[in-house]
Curated annotation (Swiss-Prot):
One of the primary rRNA binding proteins. Required for association of the 30S and 50S subunits to form the 70S ribosome, for tRNA binding and peptide bond formation. It has been suggested to have peptidyltransferase activity; this is somewhat controversial. Makes several contacts with the 16S rRNA in the 70S ribosome. Part of the 50S ribosomal subunit. Forms a bridge to the 30S subunit in the 70S ribosome. It comes from the Bacteria. PANTHER family: LARGE RIBOSOMAL SUBUNIT PROTEIN UL2M (PTHR13691:SF5), RIBOSOMAL PROTEIN L2 (PTHR13691). GO terms for biological process: cytoplasmic translation. This is Large ribosomal subunit protein uL2. It comes from Staphylococcus saprophyticus subsp. saprophyticus (strain ATCC 15305 / DSM 20229 / NCIMB 8711 / NCTC 7292 / S-41).
Length: 277
C-alpha cells in the first residue's frame, strides 16, 4: 500500500500521512469470525489501572485469527484481503475446500484467488505453512511457533519477517529482525514470506486526535508531576531528575536498564543476542 499525503490546510494536516488501502478488497468482515471486544481502559478485573495511556478510541470487534495453520491436506482459496483494527498487518480470509472459513495474517504479495495449503507436503510459496524442518535454508518466514501446536508468536506485525539460517539436530536456527539468532524446535510451524503492509511504520499520525481514535491517551512526563506521583517530580521550575539514573513511575531504573530475567530457561536456545543499537 502506498502512503497518502494531505494538503496542509490545517496544522494537524501539515505532515499527516495515511495508507491508501489499495490492497483491501473487502470492507465488511466475516460475521462468523467476529467476537466482542469490550473496552478495559487499561484496568484489570478490580478496576485498578494496570496499563497506562489506554482508553477511549473507536469501537472494535475482534477478528479470530488462525495462528496455528493446522488444517493440513485441504486447499484454501484467498477470498479477500481485509483491514484489521486490532493489529498493524492486514488479514486474509481463506475459504477451504470443505467450506470452512479462517482468517490469517496477510503476507506481502498475497493475491485474491491464490490457493494456499499447510502441512509437511505444502509447496514453498508465499502464504503456505509448514514445519520448520521442511523449509529450505535461506527462506524468509513469519508467524513462527515457539512451541509445537501453540500457534505463531514471532514475526506477526506489519513488515515483520525472520530467516532460516541452518539446521542442527532437532533444532532449526532462525535469525530474527533484531539480529538475534535463536534455536527453535524443527516441529514448530512457520508461514512462508514476509508480513504485508510494510509501509505501516512510515505513517505520520499528524495530530493528537488521531491517536485518541486509536485508543491511545496522552503520555505525561514525570518531570512535570508532583513528587508523590513520580520519582522525577517536584523541585523548583525545570529541576533535574536528582537520581543516578532515570526511574519508572514505580521507582525502578529504566531507559537502558535490562529487564530480562537472569536465568531464563530459553537462554540456552539463544545462539547470538540481538544487535545493540
Amino acid at each position: 500500500m502506498a502512503l497518502k499525503k494531505y494538503k496542509p490546510i490545517t496544522n494537524g494536516r501539515r505532515n499527516m500521512t495515511s495508507l491508501d488501502f489499495a490492497e483491501i478488497t473487502k470492507t465488511t468482515p466475516e460475521k462468523s469470525l467476529l467476537q466482542p471486544l469490550p473496552k478495559r481502559a487499561g484496568r484489570n478485573n478490580q478496576g485498578k489501572l494496570t496499563v497506562r495511556h489506554h482508553g477511549g478510541g473507536h469501537k472494535r470487534q475482534y477478528r479470530v485469527i488462525d495462528f496455528k495453520r493446522n488444517k493440513d491436506g485441504i486447499n484454501a482459496k484467498v477470498d479477500s484481503i481485509q483491514y484489521d483494527p486490532n493489529r498493524s498487518a492486514n488479514i486474509a480470509l481463506l475459504v477451504y475446500a470443505d467450506g470452512e472459513k479462517r482468517y490469517i495474517i496477510a503476507p506481502k504479495n498475497l493475491k485474491v484467488g491464490q490457493v494456499l495449503e499447510s502441512g509437511e507436503e505444502a509447496d514453498i510459496k508465499v502464504g503456505n505453512a509448514l514445519p520448520l524442518q521442511f523449509i529450505p535454508v535461506g527462506t524468509v518466514i513469519h508467524n513462527i511457533e515457539l512451541k509445537p501446536g501453540k500457534g505463531g508468536q514471532i514475526a506477526r506485525s506489519a513488515g515483520a519477517s525472520a530467516q532460516v539460517l541452518g539446521k542442527e539436530g532437532k533444532y532449526v536456527l532462525i535469525r530474527l529482525r533484531s539480529g538475534e539468532v535463536r534455536m527453535i524446535l524443527s516441529t514448530c510451524r512457520a508461514t512462508i514470506g514476509q508480513v504485508g503492509n510494510i509501509q505501516h511504520e512510515l505513517v505520520n499520525v499528524g495530530k493528537a486526535g488521531r491517536s485518541r481514535w486509536k485508543g491511545i491517551r496522552p503520555t505525561v512526563r514525570g518531570s512535570v508531576m508532583n513528587p508523590n506521583d513520580h520519582p522525577h517530580g517536584g523541585g523548583e521550575g525545570r529541576a533535574p531528575i536528582g537520581r543516578p539514573s532515570p526511574m519508572s513511575p514505580w521507582g525502578k531504573p529504566t531507559l537502558g536498564k535490562k529487564t530480562r530475567r537472569g536465568k531464563k530457561s530459553s537462554d540456552k536456545l539463544i545462539v547470538r543476542g540481538r544487535k545493540k543499537k
